[in-house]
């Protein structure tokens, strides 16, 4: 037992988006600095040849975009996080985009795998990129 900073934190999509917007802004939002630009860069840069992850966030798979947790249309610089309950949040610095998807994939119970099997998070993110292309 004990307390952990995962699988049990609750927030609104708006507040999650503000945290990710702060990261996109290099650690600052509304004129207030929370993290240095260097820290944001460290958290979001791939740091290993054997993992696609940064120190704090997931990244697309450079060798096979279909293997990662984001849409194949997402540019290489995106970073984000997927959660056990089906949530995800991604930052796209190239397009200055923050994408937040909050869900409860474990309803009615933990064996519900439809959200993952149907690639819902990636498909929604892909639809966003498709809409941006049409603009």
Question: Predicted regions span which residues?
Answer:
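Catalytic loop of the DD-peptidase/beta-lactamase superfamily, centered on the K-T-G motif
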Residues: 1-135
């Amino acid at each position: 037992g004990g307390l952990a900073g995962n699988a049990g934190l609750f927030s609104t999509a708006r507040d999650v988006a503000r945290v990710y917007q702060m990261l996109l802004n290099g650690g600052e939002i509304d004129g207030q600095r929370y993290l240095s630009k260097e820290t944001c860069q460290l958290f979001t840069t791939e740091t290993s040849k054997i993992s696609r992850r940064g120190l704090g966030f997931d990244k697309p798979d450079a060798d096979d975009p279909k293997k990662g947790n984001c849409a194949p249309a997402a540019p290489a610089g995106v970073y984000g996080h997927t959660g056990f309950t089906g949530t995800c949040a991604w930052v796209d610095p190239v397009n200055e985009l923050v994408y937040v998807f909050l869900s409860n994939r474990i309803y009615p119970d933990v064996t519900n795998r439809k959200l993952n099997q149907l690639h819902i998070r990636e498909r929604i993110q892909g639809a966003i990129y498709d809409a941006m292309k049409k603009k």
